[in-house]
Regions:
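Short glycine-/small-residue motifs
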Residues: 140-141
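Conserved active-site tyrosine of GNAT-family acetyltransferases
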Residues: 33-38, 109, 136
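Vicinal oxygen chelate
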Residues: 2-22, 44-97, 104-132, 144-151
């Protein structure tokens, strides 16, 4: 496996109709994090952001990741300050990537520099493992057992 394939639909940003879900991460270094997600997950960088506050926009498979340095408060978030996780072992949320072949993704992404906390482990009807990114965020990678249905 040399690439993770996704259907041929487009996921536009900004969307021309309806909406698109994106995930925002506060990072210490936008360039470093952008290159990490580009290299490990074959992300397509649309914009590298700037020092005026514009975030990095990266398309990863069928979703968008926005990266920006911390700060605040701002007029639209008057009581909120954004920062990277102070303790990478105490997090309140994480990204979850569902894959068709976890072993292939594990080998490919590890060869591209992903730091896995463990190898894939079978648990609750799926195999899963976690990656830690350069800012300490974790990313779950999971493959459901055959026959598992959602909904």
């Amino acid at each position: 496996m040399t690439n993770v394939e996704v259907d041929k639909k487009t996921y536009e940003m900004p969307p021309k109709e309806g909406f698109t879900v994106a995930h925002f991460l506060t990072v210490a270094d936008m360039e470093r994090s952008a290159r990490y997600y580009e290299k490990v997950f074959d992300g397509r960088i649309l914009s590298m952001g700037d020092t005026e506050g514009a975030p990095v926009y990266i398309q990863i498979a069928n979703t968008w990741l926005l990266l920006n340095v911390g700060g605040g408060p701002t007029p639209d978030k008057p009581t909120v300050i954004l920062s990277v996780p102070p303790d990478p072992n105490r997090l309140s949320s994480f990204m979850n990537i569902r894959v068709a072949d976890i072993q292939a993704c594990y080998k490919l992404w590890k060869s591209r520099g992903a730091e896995f906390i463990t190898e894939p482990i079978d648990k609750y009807g799926e195999a899963r493992c976690y990656i830690r990114d350069p800012d300490g965020y974790i990313i779950e990678v999971g493959q459901s057992d055959p026959g598992v249905k959602y909904g």
